[in-house]
């Protein structure tokens, strides 16, 4: 797993990569990139790829091997405070949720919401998380798609 600041500079992940590898389902094979970005950058990405003008918490961009996750650090810090757990725990919740989107799960599809919720519950329990993202009353993140090259360029802007 490669973790960056959204501008191509590597940053420490605080054990997020090891944790995610331990809880990920077997179908999650390949390379995963994670970018931590500001709320303003996330708002711009959300507007560009989903036509929603607000900073969401996590976006998932499927790629050739697995894909990329973009996590808004400000949103994550606020959600951690509101949920009563640590920032690191919130990053795990968001990374797990985003990974499920990369694997094809979609809670915005009524036919798939229950399937995604069940998988999220199973994996978060495996990873020692008490709460998942689907069960919370927050603005729902969703998968967004783009070509790998334009995606990487968009994240670094």
What are the functions of these language-model segments?
Residues 1-92, 100-157:
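An acidic/histidine-cluster motif and surrounding catalytic segment
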């Amino acid at each position: 797993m490669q973790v960056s600041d959204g501008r191509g500079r590597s940053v420490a992940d605080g054990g997020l990569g090891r944790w995610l590898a331990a809880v990920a389902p077997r179908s999650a094979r390949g390379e995963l990139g994670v970018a931590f970005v500001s709320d303003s950058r996330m708002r711009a990405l959300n507007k560009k790829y989903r036509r929603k003008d607000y900073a969401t918490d996590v976006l998932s961009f499927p790629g050739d091997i697995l894909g990329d996750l973009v996590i808004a650090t400000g949103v994550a810090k606020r959600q951690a405070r509101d949920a009563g757990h640590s920032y690191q725990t919130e990053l795990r919740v968001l990374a797990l949720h985003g990974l499920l989107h990369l694997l094809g799960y979609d809670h915005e599809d009524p036919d798939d919401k229950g399937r995604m919720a069940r998988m999220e519950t199973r994996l978060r329990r495996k990873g020692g998380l008490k709460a998942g993202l689907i069960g919370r009353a927050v603005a729902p993140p969703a998968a967004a798609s783009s070509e790998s090259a334009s995606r990487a360029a968009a994240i670094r802007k």
